[in-house]
Amino acid sequence: MTQDITQQDVLDAPFMKEMMNTTYDMWKLGWDELNGGNISYLLKEEEVRSYFDLNQVKRTISLDFPVIELANQYFLVTGSGKFFRKIIENPEECLAVLRVTSDGESVELLWGLSDGGRPTSELASHFMSHIVRLKHDPNHRVIMHTHATNLIAMTFTHELDEVQFTRTLWQMCTECLVVFPEGVGILPWMVPGTSEIGKATAEKMNEYRLAIWSHHGIFGAGESIDQVFGLIETVEKAAKVYNLVNAHPDGAKQVITDQQLIDLAEAFHVNPPNKYFS
């Protein structure tokens, strides 16, 4: 006997509320214009089972890349071409609950994309990054991509060297080194929506939870939507400070010093790699 579950029950799910509220917040911040940005949220089977009949597959969508490592895993993802500002109004059209097939060659749609749409065009980057982050953190659950305004601007005016870029961010806001002590990865400009950018992003995820797409946006990874949103929010704040400082005719008169960064790391028990201080 299948459980009779109404749409309202589904929209009351904590993971659904998180996705709806966060995407709206991201739009209000100006990070996700038009259909920009995408999120994927790894769900536990017991979470999904409480709201969906797992035997009812609406349709199967083939993948251009195999993800056997994610076989039988469940994801809540944003849809391709969907506006973040509309998700809170029409989640069933704009979101999707997917299950990766046992062979990793396809995903099964359990809910959502009611207009016949498809999952985010960046699904390759998301799945590849999930695979890598799960190897480093078994509690990993979220990949988030957004067009953070000040960070994009910074990729035009700052050298795209990961060590120097990270150091600059750390020097702009005291909390930065504490929030992302491993630093940030940087990709050169690449065509989005391809397996190539997915592979390059996943490679960065071996070392970082944040991968900047030059002149485009940022990818973030973490254990919850709040954690990843906070990571990106912190980087974006530092980039804004950098842009404000560099707009001043005299630039910066002082910054947080290396010794102060070292003292900060010791005080908060984080271990930034030595490469940032050599």
Swiss-Prot record:
Record GO biological process: pentose catabolic process; rhamnose catabolic process
Cofactor(s) the protein needs: Zn(2+)
Annotated InterPro entries: Aldolase_class_II_sugar_metab, Aldolase_II/adducin_N, Aldolase_II/adducin_N_sf, Rhamnulose-1-P_Aldolase
Reactions listed under catalytic activity: L-rhamnulose 1-phosphate = (S)-lactaldehyde + dihydroxyacetone phosphate
Active site residues according to the UniProt entry: E122
Family annotation (HAMAP family): RhaD
Stated name of the protein: Rhamnulose-1-phosphate aldolase
Gene source species: Oceanobacillus iheyensis (strain DSM 14371 / CIP 107618 / JCM 11309 / KCTC 3954 / HTE831)
Gene designation: rhaD
